[in-house]
Amino acid sequence: MSYKENSFYQDILVSECFYVATKSKQLIGYEILGESRVCLWSDKTLAQPFLDAKGIDFDKVKKIDVDRFVTYELDNIFNEGDQVLVNPTTKSDGELVDVVKVSDELMSDLDSIRLKEFAKDVAKEDAVFGLSEKGAKQFALISDDEHQRPHIMPVWSIKSRAEKVRREDFDTLELVEIEGAVFDDWLDTLRDDDKAVAIDLKPGVVGTVVSAQKVIDQLAF
């Protein structure tokens, strides 16, 4: 079952975030079909009226970045087949969805969208930004040990995004700009060495990681 046509799915795809209610730092659920389900909302304004109407005590409604959730929290909180209640309101019971499946589908679509946007920006500006050790002639590689990805080259198509991540997560490295043609050559080497590319990472080092071949294919369009 695909969730692509659901309105909540499209909302999260655009905003790249969702909202949950917490009490003492624990996720709040609501009993439906005899079982308590964690509630989440694609629109923050839907949460409090529902919680108040149901008499559910909570500390706050918290914004969750979907990349950070999938990278650091999903596997620690949920198991395969677990369902969450999406967008319950005072007028609607909401939808029960498989949290792992919908997360996988969202990330697949986000990866595709980001890769296309990256390629479009690079074609327009003929510039790619990366991080480098002082004096080095190559972009730095990072590791994602948790997902067994030891060699990843983070790159950005927009300088301000790159600088924000550099400042918050890699302050010992320098921001470097190269031309698109140089990046094309580097991609061939990354592909031959079976290394990955991180596209427009967010602070916290979360976001889209794809094979070098996928980037090559997209830039060819």
List each language-model region with its residue ranges.
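Conserved NAD+-utilizing ADP-ribose enzyme module
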Residues: 1-221
